[in-house]
């Protein structure tokens, strides 16, 4: 609602409703910080109200738009309380004045059915007479005078941090929009601060001064006697004023920001992403015109509706839900002074949308009768009381100080207010929260009691007022036309930053929120009552309708009133029998339901559940509307029509017919409803044209169409519109929020792009759905696709809401035209363009012309000519058709054109109205320019309308009458399935659009017009569009209504509907008509129009592919797309132009989001094909490999448009690596949510894109069947990152390079390293053989296969890395080990990645191999076959790779079976087979332990055979010291100890893997010690014995404790040793085995508590043993951070520094990840190990001294410890890439923050406490001094890593990253890109988080792994 508090409360109720809908995931934590904003509340509010379009933001642009932050930055609730005194006095005085005026207006409105235009004029006069007459509560001003300037505008600012967490960001935004929309500008300026003082005397004085209207008296007397009720009512009214008017204004800024925010939240992609969105949204948020346009006209209409609905209690209760915002003090006089009692009630209700509604629900029964008397003073006091309570609530729920500055980006503010206010107040304790909130429960009970008394009367009065409502519907229609533009006021230029869906929802926030609260009160009743289920769903539909209303303020008000009607209808229908209970319930539930309704509105937009509910209850909703039609169905009809407005360009008329048929008072309400629909359409259009606001054009015309069509709209059409709208609203929010859930790279840029595109698409969907609804009106059936379209259109309505100021001005126009609307709508329409000019909405003026004309025509022939109407609107919309049937057709088409203008805005439908739409779209930035252009075009259009019809016919490729063309267009655009072949193509596209446009609408719901979105996508497009709009306007001058622009947008529609598959007939026709119109109407502008249309088509095609299944088709079509126009989008393949657009869009589908759109526009300016061609080449620059991927990213990454632009747009191949990391993140984490929430099937294309790099990697070095697997395996999305790094190392081609920039630059470094140590072809062949035969083909071993496939072929990645070099193999093997635990699903891949990471870190490549080899054998014996087997396959594969690659002979003997230990612990099912393999190899490995070094070599050589393939994987060749030194020098992760990546064998499974690893480590250590003999750090036997024995025992004890990790930690006993694993030197590498053994022995025998030293670190690795196997090692383990970290392989494995640091922390086995989290000391090591994998980056983050050490300082101890760590690392490696990317990013951030390691910020993955693979390969090769130095911070780091990794890191992702040291590095690239999830594991920052966990935390392996899994 208007007031943030009630909005918050409403959000709670909405969240309740969402929970009912099954959207419990919504955390309604939107903290509406009540901001007192000193707003310049001059008397010009009336001026604004009258000249909403022109002077809507006289002060609002300054204060509202200028920013709440700078003006009301520190104003808090208390400030509101203080300022509320003045506001109470002033605002209530104004309330009385306005109430008085509104009372007369209400009286007039009672006659307004006959005097709709009169009412508008009277309303205008009212505004003129009383500048603050619009929203009653808006009149509460800080200044003492009625229009005191500089008043504190109180509004609850959204806490955008919470919003980012909030799925229901739209709820918040809608709440603010309700705030902003309800109050007129002046009132918004002045509504700031009434509420805090309960008995604020100025409030009462104002009420008294204003005359203590019946409302005030009623409020005062009814609530708490004159004083208490006045105080409560005055507080409520003051709150209504503050929150209603100020919230409107605030919500203009907030809803602008919040709506985009909410779009992000609705996207539910990432809570962490939302904050970024929030910050981007906040600057875009403007408080300028939203409240004024939404509040004053819409409030007036809403209030009129209330007054007409003379059921004061019920309606007021309902109005509390819905009209509270607008119908308080200001709106009541503004809307309907006639129905003063209803007005007061409504005003009260409307003002406190959620809380004030609650409060007034409490006071309503008492107040309702007294409200009219004491409405002004009582409302002022109620507002004070309410605001006091609200402030109290905010202080309670919100952490007052925080919530005060959500615009200051107080995330906790929204969090506290949203979560507490919503959850506590509504979800947890609605009544209890109401007590802390502004309304106390006592007052609520009082209001409930009085409402129980009065609610029946309210219902009766509603029924009595039904005819009034019909009149009021007419009046309200004009008001709503203005009020609908008030929504566009909300959707002014800053609206586009918001999400379009949010615009829809939030535009309807102030009135619609009230309605929604009514809706949700009714919904609550419905839910409570068995019969209420459908109605509650219908209320949800009304909630969606509310969004649509916000879409167009006239719709918003009308829908608000209609929502009230729905509530009244629904409530009378159901709770009439139980009116007392219902009243109480509505008192209570209305507060709850208001929130629910608000959330429901967002749910409607966000959730397909709302669509489902609509499916369930849409008919019931329609029935209820029909049933209530006699009572107050008119309002409900308007609501329904509002619902259909956004979603049906054509359907609004159909809806109106529906409603008209079903409602007794059909003519006026239906007419109003039709106007609503049209208004929404035009609102969106104007939103596009004018920066955010040109939607008013659609609003006015919608209303007129509604008002006229309402008479001719059958209930079926109404039903159709309602159903369609509800579904569409759901989808729009969902898609919109999904769109915004992208990681916030540059959400502002991406949002701009996405919003522009989405607005385009949404408008196109509006057009399509409107066509479908016209058709459906004829058919009189509402398809769910239409309903979804309605929801999408509803999202567009949010954009229109941004154009609310234009809608408001159009409302003023409609006020003038209201009287003559019924008489001469066309004349009015022609006059209104002048009015639009007057109101600085030229385009909207034209739209108003069309609206009036369309309304008249729709009245005449809405249902029959609905399709014609779309076409005729396009063709001759400004020009009234000369013959009556043609006139009806034309005007209906005009209405449709208004609707379609918005649709064309997004969809670029080829209807002549699209030319009108194009300037509308372009008005996003060139609003006035485009408006002028559009006016010229529309004037010409009126002149050239007949030719326009002809052009439409030709352009649609079907020379048909306007009727037929419109039908076809409607069929193609609106109807998902259409009989015509083109329509069938369009059906596929439209069905996709129904789902895709949902997302597109969501994207465009960002509040950006399509052009704005395109501008964001590519500034050139947007900039070019305005330029083209001017030529388009010149060419459209004949179309006289921006039709040139609209054909351009029609092209977009074609690009979306027709470019997909050549564009359906209608889409093709639309594009052709758009192009033909562009070229035919005016040759200069026509060319530009065609170019613009092609641009729009490219954008639309881009978004089509982006939106739904088409992206997959695009995947197939992308190469041919340039050549073949219609391959991908088979909707309209008929047209070559569409094909060209398709080519451009197909090629740009990925890059279109960032650049192709821009390129299309740039080229489009010069030539259509040039534009598309350029866009297509851009796409080709990014060939198929990235296109599908970016289909997803378009939704998600478009938010991060800057990321895409910086990376993807600017030669995506250059930055494709960074963007690939983002893409991987999106596809693995964000896109999953995005796709699941949006029902988008784009995940596969993204995966395919990622898989392409996988294919590249597979082709480069795939040595196993997984090579073939990666392309078809989306599960490998996670592995795609690791796999792609491998590919990058192997093949720095487009795909690999694309991923590499994020994850693979280190691969480049390693590539150099690998060039020297390329894997032997035999090793590659053996590994491939192994994978093909064992891993891939055997389903019993399916874990490995599945994991590989799931993660994009980590085995494949292993193979390429093996081929490339041992370093690649290292990472692969490490991943396998680390993922051993997690392997059940993809842990094998994760383990591979972990092992790979260890290899990259070059921990103790030889040592790890040797040590892990024997322990793996023993562990295999010791532990369950599954555990032993799981990690073995990956490690064996990698081992084979490594051993064959680097020193096949030397490494063959080296602990080839150590990998078995790694895999042994991890997988439960697949491990057994691999375990058998490992057992077989274990015998050999143990023999090798016995000293059979040559035997091992033989085994490794045998591994080259199939048996030996497995064994080769198991066996680790000796890596000569030279090789190790070279590896370490190269900075690659020397996982080769004995020429093998043995250190990767850190079993990410339980400690049993470590146990096995330790025994295997004995043999491997023997082999290594043979190498390490030079170092002589440890006796091979010591290590062998201790490791095999103590660690076997410890692994047995700590099977659940990641002893394998600890075993690795023992290897990285010392920082030097562990760093040596990162690459100390070949001697140290050799010493690693010995050092690990020796350190383990030292720690065992000496129990060195100084294990923090380098050697102690290796002992700490032994600490794994120390916990259970090696008691001696256990003590040092706790001490040794590296050991602990390695022990907690899953946790610290992702970061080598974490491994080492955790090893330092000691006792990682006991700690499990706790030990791992003691790695902070080794953060530099982790960084350096990463330097091994990615030397450059490691050096970057590692200390300068460590940089050299990274290569050379690989201590043997570190290598040994790292080998052990690698053994443990496996589990999280692959997985973190997948889901935990955000988690990993967060944890990594925590770890990075906590870790103070100077140089080792490069830890690959934050430690996942439960994932052993998080011991990161990138163990920095620090000197032991460095390592020791890091030992101190290790505890912090371990804790953070463990907690962060466990909670957030997906084991698979961790494995993936940990396995790939380059993955760690590329994770760094994600960090650079601001990826939360891909934040580079910063060892320097990680140790503190590790310390969180502390070395003491020694969970068992199961605990550690489980914790990781739990948080994955």
Swiss-Prot record:
The keyword Ubl conjugation does not apply. One of its GO terms (cellular component) is cytoplasm. It comes from the Eukaryota. Its main location: cytoplasm. Disruption phenotype: RNAi-mediated knockdown results in abnormal bristle morphology. The bristle ridges are shallower than wild-type and become nonparallel and disorganized near the tip. The tip of the bristle is swollen giving it a javelin-like appearance. In 13% of animals the posterior scutellar bristles are fused. Residues 772-792, 802-869, 965-979 have a biased composition (Basic and acidic residues). Residues 553-566, 890-904, 1494-1507, 1903-1912 have a biased composition (Acidic residues). Disulfide bonds: none annotated. Keywords: Cytoplasm, Cytoskeleton, Developmental protein. GO terms for biological process: chaeta morphogenesis; parallel actin filament bundle assembly. Residues 339-354, 489-498, 568-586 have a biased composition (Polar residues). Residues 97-133, 299-313 have a biased composition (Basic residues). Residues 355-374, 499-512, 981-990 have a biased composition (Low complexity). Important for normal assembly of actin bundles during bristle formation. This is Protein javelin. It comes from Drosophila melanogaster (Fruit fly). The gene is jv.
